[in-house]
Amino acid sequence: VNKKSSNQKKELIEFYRGMLLIRRFEEKAGQLYGMGLIGGFCHLYIGQEAVVVGLEAAAKEGDKRITSYRDHGHMLACGMDPNGVMAELTGRSGGYSKGKGGSMHMFSKEKNFYGGHGIVGAQVPLGAGLAFADKYRENNCVTFTYFGDGAANQGQVYETFNMAALWLSLIHISEPTRPGI
């Protein structure tokens, strides 16, 4: 077996493990939500695991991420501890937002994860702000801004597209939200 083929196989197995972690985590979160152990809303990322795992494979250290309220899978894909994510979902102080953010408002500056946001499309211009900060700092980082297809009709989304096309290192990812509903 040549080394390149062996490394590729290992990489594919890691992708699969990442997707499986997200799927199993979300299934458990859905179960806990149904039992009333997760307060508020709980928007699952089931059916979209490959999107974030693939993009995280292309991310480099220092790159930033921002997403909507369907954020658990993103946190897991960027290497955050599943126990910390679950603690946040269940309102415990060991969560990434000290149990105050719940399902939709998690955050970790250490992992360059700038949150899930509850307002449809609001994260898109916020992602542009993160990208502008990187441009001013001249640090060659990229911001990954995820949004659901429901945000695609929001004015600020298209305004941000125009800004990004002209000036920013910003990748917009439109995810179909139907699989998670």
Language-model regions, residue ranges each:
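Short beta-strand segments at enzyme active-site cores
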Residues: 143, 171-174
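A generic structural signal for nonpolar/aromatic side chains embedded in well-ordered alpha-helices
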Residues: 19, 86-89, 173
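Single conserved hydrophobic/aromatic residue that forms the stacking wall/gate
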Residues: 172, 178-181
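Short, cationic motifs built from Arg/Lys/His that form the positively charged side of catalytic pockets
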Residues: 23, 70, 175-177
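Cofactor-/ligand-binding subdomain signature composed of acidic, glycine-rich
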Residues: 1-39, 61
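Cofactor-binding active-site loop characterized by glycine-rich and histidine/acidic residues
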Residues: 27-30, 35-167
